[in-house]
Each structure stands twice: as C-alpha cells, then as structure tokens.
C-alpha cells in the first residue's frame, strides 16, 4: 500500500520566515516495494522517489492546481524504457496519480 512519508507546507514555512505564499503543500508518498523495484533497475532513480504531488493555489488561474512528474517520464529519464517490468510498474503509477488527482478534483466540486 501507499505510505505518506511527508507533508511539506511551504506556505506555513514561508509565513514563519516572514514571507507570503499562497497555499502550497507537497505530499511525498509511495509504496516502498514498488519504488525498490525501480531502484533495483537503476539506483539513480532514487533521486526522484518517493513520488511527490504539489497542491497549490494559482492566483492567476484562480484555482487550485495539482502538479506532479509522471512516473513514466522516469523510465525515459533513467534509461529504463527497455525494462518491460518497469514499464508495467510506471504505467500503474501514472494511473494511480491520475486517479488521485481526479478524486481530489471531484471532491472539490
């Protein structure tokens, strides 16, 4: 299952530093077993794991934005495109992140 490793409230930290920042939070999460399989294929991918999801208020757009790097981009970035097992894993990770964002967006309506 998924594990939440950290929640970083950048706007609270900005306020503590005497600065202003619209609501901005980053969630760091993942499944250690899945991440380990990716790192076994190329340990350098550890730089990008666990996954991160940024949630912030964009005043210009007038809405809340959810932003993340697609796990499938990691396969290309770390030369894992030829690993069929990795492709299956990152496809599932892409779908998971899309599902999370869809669920959050639907809950906000």
Where are the predicted features?
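Feature detects long, helix-prone N-terminal segments enriched in hydrophobes
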Residues: 1-109
């Amino acid at each position: 299952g998924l594990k939440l490793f950290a929640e970083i409230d950048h706007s609270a930290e900005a306020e503590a530093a005497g600065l202003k920042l619209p609501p901005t939070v980053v969630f760091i999460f993942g499944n250690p077993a899945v991440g380990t399989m990716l790192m076994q294929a190329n340990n350098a991918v550890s730089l990008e794991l666990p996954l991160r999801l940024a949630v912030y208020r964009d005043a210009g757009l007038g809405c809340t934005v959810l932003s993340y790097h697609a796990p499938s981009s990691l396969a290309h970035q770390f030369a894992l495109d030829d690993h069929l097992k990795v492709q299956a894993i990152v496809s599932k990770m892409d779908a998971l992140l899309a599902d999370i964002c869809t669920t959050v967006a639907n809950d906000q309506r």
